[in-house]
């Protein structure tokens, strides 16, 4: 017996000694790397949040009419639960990092789709992503490029220009004197990503058992589809070159060039381009950059991507969109960064989406219903129209291009996001998957416009309408062999674009009493182009 005890003690001592040596020698070891720690933290946070929601209305039978009525109002107790839960979720994302931060950022971008308590709390994740050490950065570069940093670069800044959920960017100078930006993937994120997504899927399914009306599987599906693409930096480089070629006619757009000879799946080398963030009004004022011009350029660029090309940069948060004065011409320029996340729209989706926006802009409510339902909205088409435009249903009915959004309307929309959360989550589960990233992109762009004070101008809607007209005309011409029919389509396109120009001219002089009468006459003589 004593011999067995001695043997057990010896083996235990050896195991502890080996563990001690491993822990001491492995400089990159972090408790967060252990699956049990990450899983335990996620399960515990989900359980606490679920318990908080379940007990907030413990005196009211769950699922009863009274429960639904209380929940549908902005009841102070529920607002407090939203806030507590959002903070817990934010802490979980910061602790587990990587994929969790990426998903948290996605949720934080959905300003008009989720309760404000969640979006305002989770927005900090865009600026609080944890940083990899220089030892880890050197390790990734050594493994992927087969050389040390000093062999590749004349100089390399240890302090990153920016840190995101999946990677961080450093400024460096090549031996030939060219200044470059070096994007390096966090070393552990790729290995953890598939396990993290599986964990999220299990937790979302568990929460659905407790709260059947809340359907968030769309979020897991999106992460499962997009994360592998975002983790492949060669794919990001290809996207950058594609969008640069696609939008080459916009002289205000700058996409940094890729250095393919020093790029891998985890390291991306690109031309270094300096500038201020697109929501930084002070930077624009100091550099004499016209805020309204930048807002118009941004709207033109994204309308072209969505309606004409169907290839959309889906992460336009301010850190990924810079502005600057072109060093040669002195003209204002938009610098588009981070090309890891793009959405390729099918032709059917793109054309239906064009028709829907034309209907919304020109207040054709019959077609709003028709094309919303074609895009999967069903009987919830009024809510879907409000989600797309971030306007109230009254404003949609009156015409979203007739008046800009007011502070009162904006507050009403944000409050309704909490009130209609089950219906919103139902819609997000039933619309085409392509729509999810488009909605996220729309909300990020609105956030930029709100920061610049240029949101929802009539001019921006007219620019969208121009792109829709061009896209629909191009589709019709592509599907006919008749020269006469193609000529007819081209004439109709030119006439509809002329209407848009005339409408825009009238809006510029709308302060005159005569303008309203002229506008009414024009709208009566020339129906909305669809």
Swiss-Prot record:
Catalytic positions are 315 (proton acceptor)
Provide the alphabetized UniProt keywords: ATP-binding, Kinase, Mitochondrion, Nucleotide-binding, Serine/threonine-protein kinase, Transferase, Transit peptide
- What molecular function does GO assign, one term? protein serine/threonine kinase activity
Q: Which GO terms describe its cellular component?
A: mitochondrial inner membrane; mitochondrion
Its predominant location is mitochondrion
Q: Which residues take part in binding ATP? A: 161-169, 183
> What EC number is given for this enzyme?
2.7.-.-
SUPFAM superfamilies assigned to the protein according to its UniProt record, in alphabetical order:
Protein kinase-like (PK-like) (SSF56112)
- The keyword Transferase is assigned to this record: yes
**Annotated localization:** Mitochondrion
Q: Which domain of life is it from?
A: Eukaryota
Name all Protein kinase domain ranges.
155-467
What is any Pfam family matched here? ABC1
Presence of keyword Manganese: no
Supply the enzyme class, top level. transferase
Q: Which biological process, per GO, is one annotated for this protein?
A: mitochondrion organization
Task: Indicate the family of this protein.
Answer: Belongs to the protein kinase superfamily. ADCK protein kinase family.
Q: PANTHER family, per this entry?
A: AARF DOMAIN-CONTAINING PROTEIN KINASE 1 (PTHR43173:SF19), ABC1 FAMILY PROTEIN (PTHR43173)
As for what it does, the entry says:
Appears to be essential for maintaining mitochondrial cristae formation and mitochondrial function by acting via YME1L1 in a kinase-independent manner to regulate essential mitochondrial structural proteins OPA1 and IMMT. The action of this enzyme is not yet clear. It is not known if it has protein kinase activity and what type of substrate it would phosphorylate (Ser, Thr or Tyr).
Q: What is this protein called?
A: AarF domain-containing protein kinase 1
């Amino acid at each position: 017996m004593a011999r067995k005890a001695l043997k057990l003690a010896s083996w235990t001592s050896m195991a502890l000694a080996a563990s001690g040596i491993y822990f001491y020698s492995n400089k990159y070891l972090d408790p967060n790397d252990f699956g049990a720690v990450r899983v335990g933290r996620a399960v515990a946070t989900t359980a606490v949040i679920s318990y908080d929601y379940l007990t907030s209305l413990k005196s009211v039978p769950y699922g009863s009419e009274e429960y639904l009525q209380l929940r549908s109002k902005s009841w102070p107790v529920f607002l407090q639960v939203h806030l507590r839960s959002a903070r817990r979720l934010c802490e979980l994302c910061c602790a587990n990092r990587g994929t969790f931060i990426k998903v948290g950022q996605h949720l934080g971008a959905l300003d008009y789709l989720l309760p404000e308590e969640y979006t305002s709390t989770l927005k900090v994740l865009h600026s609080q992503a944890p940083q990899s050490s220089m030892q880890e950065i050197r390790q990734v570069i050594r493994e992927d490029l087969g050389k040390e940093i000093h062999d590749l670069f004349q100089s390399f800044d240890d302090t990153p220009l920016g840190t995101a959920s999946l990677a961080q960017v450093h400024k460096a100078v090549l031996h030939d004197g060219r200044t470059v930006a070096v994007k390096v993937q966090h070393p552990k994120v790729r290995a953890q990503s598939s396990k993290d997504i599986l964990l999220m899927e299990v937790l979302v399914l568990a929460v659905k058992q407790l709260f059947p009306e809340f359907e968030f599987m769309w979020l897991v599906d999106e992460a499962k589809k997009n994360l592998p693409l975002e983790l492949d930096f060669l794919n990001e480089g290809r996207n950058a070159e594609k969008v640069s070629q696609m939008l080459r006619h916009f002289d205000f757009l700058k996409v940094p060039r890729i250095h393919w000879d020093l790029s891998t799946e985890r390291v991306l080398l690109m031309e270094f381009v300096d500038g201020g963030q697109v929501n930084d009004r002070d930077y624009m004022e100091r550099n004499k950059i016209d805020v309204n011009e930048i807002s118009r350029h941004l709207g033109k660029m994204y309308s072209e991507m969505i309606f004409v090309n169907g290839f959309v940069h889906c992460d336009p948060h301010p850190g990924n969109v810079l502005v600057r004065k072109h060093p040669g011409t002195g003209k204002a320029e938009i610098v588009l960064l981070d090309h890891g996340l793009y959405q390729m729209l099918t032709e059917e989706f793109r054309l239906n989406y064009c028709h829907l926006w034309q209907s919304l802009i020109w207040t054709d409510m019959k077609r709003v219903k028709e094309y919303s339902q074609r895009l999967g909205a069903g009987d919830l088409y009024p809510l879907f129209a409000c989600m797309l435009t971030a306007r109230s249903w009254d404003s949609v009915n009156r015409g979203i291009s007739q008046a800009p959004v007011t502070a009162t309307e904006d507050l009403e929309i944000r409050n309704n996001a909490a009130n209609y959360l089950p219906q919103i989550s139902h819609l997000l589960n039933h619309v085409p998957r392509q729509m999810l990233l488009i909605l996220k992109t729309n909300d990020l762009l609105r956030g930029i416009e709100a920061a610049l004070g240029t949101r929802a101008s009539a001019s921006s809607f007219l620019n969208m309408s121009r792109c829709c007209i061009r896209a629909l005309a191009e589709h019709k011409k592509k599907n006919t062999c008749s020269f006469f029919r193609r000529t007819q389509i081209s004439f109709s396109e030119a006439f509809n674009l002329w209407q848009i120009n005339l409408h825009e001219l009238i809006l510029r002089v709308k302060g005159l009493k005569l303008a309203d009468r002229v506008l009414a006459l024009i709208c009566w003589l020339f129906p909305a182009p669809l």
